[in-house]
């Protein structure tokens, strides 16, 4: 089979710049839809519907479904789908730039109601997209995403493990995180070079470790994990003196992965009350989020 044919599925050639890998394994699709468990009357939104592998079985169970699709050709296919077109609201935009709050608030959600978000996310944008969606956690009921297995491990990690990092902390700050199922490369066309997994993220009704300004939680975790091999005495030296860390009950010889979310929230709230005179925000290193 030619490389071009291996990238073609249902007449559409996967586009590398959009990170497209199309799900086609019916058992996997069934298990994902069962995990989502869509119900009529719920507000459901799919990010990156692609060729409709999840869209079709979800739409079979509900009357309305909103999808966000950047690829013009795929959006056009969905508009002319024989049984989906009358059920779909198609938002042809980049999900990373889309104002989800404005859209969610336009739905006039009832008290205690939230949007249910799902998708087989392009792996090249999955982490920044989740960070984008966390901003709207108060309007979301749950999220089910297909991601790289390695990313799911990071999302679900506990302190004192190599997988534990900034992504772990930010995800678990906003959400309860649960792995759902693992998916082999053969379930996709073209097959990715990595294993995949589905994760469920359920935003907390009440944040367990609230911070006064999430900027400072981002700030302190970025600095700590950018230098994760250093002790916190050294890694956070531009933000805290050793005496200040000790007063906050932080072990000076601990490393970034040893602190809990509660510890980082305590540090963030102290920084909010005592911001450094000069704040040189460190660049976020992708491998540490």
Curated annotation (Swiss-Prot):
Gene Ontology MF annotations: 16S rRNA (adenine(1518)-N(6)/adenine(1519)-N(6))-dimethyltransferase activity; RNA binding
Catalyzed reaction equations: adenosine(1518)/adenosine(1519) in 16S rRNA + 4 S-adenosyl-L-methionine = N(6)-dimethyladenosine(1518)/N(6)-dimethyladenosine(1519) in 16S rRNA + 4 S-adenosyl-L-homocysteine + 4 H(+)
Residues annotated as binding S-adenosyl-L-methionine: 21, 23, 48, 69, 94, 120
Superkingdom of origin organism: Bacteria
PROSITE patterns in alphabetical order: RRNA_A_DIMETH, SAM_RNA_A_N6_MT
Cellular location(s): Cytoplasm
The EC number(s) this enzyme carries: 2.1.1.182
Cellular component GO terms, alphabetical: cytosol
Main location class: cytoplasm
Keywords for this protein: Cytoplasm, Methyltransferase, RNA-binding, rRNA processing, S-adenosyl-L-methionine, Transferase
The protein, known as: Ribosomal RNA small subunit methyltransferase A
Naturally occurring in which organism (per UniProt): Actinobacillus pleuropneumoniae serotype 5b (strain L20)
Gene coding for it: rsmA
């Amino acid at each position: 089979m030619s490389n071009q044919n291996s990238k073609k599925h249902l007449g559409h050639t996967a586009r590398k710049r959009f990170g497209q890998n199309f799900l086609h394994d019916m058992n996997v699709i069934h298990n994902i839809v069962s995990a989502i468990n869509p119900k009529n009357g719920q507000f459901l939104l799919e990010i990156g519907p692609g060729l409709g592998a999840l869209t079709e079985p979800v739409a079979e169970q509900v009357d309305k479904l909103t999808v966000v699709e950047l690829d013009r050709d795929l959006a056009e296919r969905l508009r002319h789908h024989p049984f989906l077109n009358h059920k779909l609201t198609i938002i042809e935009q980049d999900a990373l730039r889309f104002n989800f709050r404005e859209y969610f608030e336009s739905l006039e959600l009832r008290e205690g109601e939230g949007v249910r978000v799902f998708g087989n996310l392009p792996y090249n944008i999955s982490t920044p997209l989740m960070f984008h969606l966390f901003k709207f956690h108060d309007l979301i009921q749950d999220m089910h995403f297909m991601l790289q297995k390695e990313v799911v491990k990071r999302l679900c990690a506990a302190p004192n493990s190599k997988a534990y990092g900034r992504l772990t902390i930010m995800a678990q700050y906003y959400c309860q995180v649960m792995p759902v199922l693992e998916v082999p490369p053969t379930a996709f066309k073209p097959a990715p070079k990595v294993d995949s997994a589905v994760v469920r993220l359920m935003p907390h009704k009440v944040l367990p470790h609230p911070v006064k300004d999430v900027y400072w939680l981002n700030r302190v975790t970025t600095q700590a994990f950018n230098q994760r091999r250093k002790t916190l005495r050294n890694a956070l030296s531009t933000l805290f003196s050793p005496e200040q860390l000790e007063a906050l009950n932080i072990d000076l010889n601990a490393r970034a992965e040893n602190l809990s979310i509660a510890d980082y929230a305590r540090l963030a709230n102290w920084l909010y009350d005592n911001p450094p005179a000069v704040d040189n925000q460190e660049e976020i290193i992708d491998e540490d989020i």
